[in-house]
Amino acid sequence: MSGVTTVEYRGRVAVITICNERKLNALDLHGYYELSERMREVATHDEVYVTLLTAKGRFFSAGADVSTIRDPPTTGEDDSGIADGGRRQWLQSFVAFNLNITQAFYSHPKILVVGLNGPVVGLSAALVSFADFIYATPSTFLLTPFSSLGLVAEGGASRALVQRLGVSKANEALLMSRRVPADELLQTGFVNKVFTELKGAKDDDVRFKELVLAEIDDKLGDHLVGDSLIGIKELIRRPEIDVLEGQNAREVFAGLGRFMSGVPQREFLKLASGEKRHKL
């Protein structure tokens, strides 16, 4: 999967857009890597102070592209002929890519604004928890079905999502795999604002992007000193960095253990075949 994101520079604002509408903006490992590179590219632009991340279509992101998940390894061998049950495969794919995309989000130096043009699921839901501001449409919901899929929390969810959503609601989302609708996301402070004027029209994603950009211009515009914005964010986030570094590693190695068990692969295959349907 390549070419699933775009980046546009608009003065002090960079706009990253996920554009894989055919798959409800689901991303495979390479799609998430591409997104991480967009984030890192924007980070190098001194003229940019605000990064807006949004998507095209009716979903922000359906999470991982389940059609790319492989069959569970059994007695696989690595390149050296060592029987490792597929461990090297998962270290080079799941572990490496998840460490990378999560670090790209929690270390992003610009003011990160996320525009949820629709539902956000799985790893994508975890990652947006690192945003400084989140705006949403009425059709938005958050779903982290890790326990339903035989996984554990990933993408920093065990720290960032819990902090942003609150322990009680985060337990419902992470442990129960419960869908959290837009009104509850607003009540908990996970999102800063829901644009209720959007009524579900086909081009709502375009209108929503315009509304979010207008909000950025109004609330984070030239009347604020850009270097001060960046400096304040760095001070706010600095105490958390060491915690996030540790939790990121703990999550991916716990996830590695789950993949070595073969359970998540079987659950993903059930989803891909239609045998199992989650409450999307």
From Swiss-Prot:
BP-aspect Gene Ontology terms: fatty acid beta-oxidation
Motif window: Peroxisome targeting signal (PTS1): 278-280
UniProt entry keywords in alphabetical sequence: Cytoplasm, Isomerase, Peroxisome, Virulence
Reactions catalysed according to its record: a (3E,5Z)-dienoyl-CoA = a (2E,4E)-(5,6-saturated)-dienoyl-CoA
Catalytic-site annotation from UniProt: E154
Alphabetized InterPro entries for the sequence: ClpP/crotonase-like_dom_sf (IPR029045), ECH/Chromodomain_protein (IPR051053), Enoyl-CoA_hydra/iso (IPR001753)
E.C. numbers: 5.3.3.21
GO cellular component: peroxisomal matrix
EC primary class: isomerase
Factors inducing expression: Expression is regulated by the transcription factor MSN2.
Record has Cytoplasm as a keyword: yes
UniProt KW Lipoprotein keyword: no
Disruption phenotype: Leads to reduced virulence with smaller lesions with restricted growth of infectious hyphae and fewer blast lesions and green islands on barley leaves. Does not affect vegetative growth, conidium production, and appressorium formation but shows defects in long-chain (oleate and olive oil) fatty acids oxidation. Results in fewer peroxisomes, more lipid droplets, and higher levels of phosphatidylglycerol, phosphatidylinositol, diacylglycerol, triacylglycerol and free fatty acids.
Biological role stated in the UniProt entry: Peroxisomal di-isomerase that is involved in fatty acid metabolism enzyme by converting 3,5-dienoyl-CoAs to the corresponding 2,4-dienoyl-CoAs. Involved in fatty acid beta-oxidation, which is important for lipid droplets degradation and infectious growth.
Similarity-based family: Belongs to the enoyl-CoA hydratase/isomerase family.
PANTHER family: ENOYL-COA DELTA ISOMERASE 2, PTHR43684
Name of the protein in question: Delta(3,5)-Delta(2,4)-dienoyl-CoA isomerase
Species of the source: Pyricularia oryzae (strain 70-15 / ATCC MYA-4617 / FGSC 8958)
Taxonomic lineage from the root: Eukaryota, Fungi, Dikarya, Ascomycota, Pezizomycotina
Name of encoding gene: DCI1
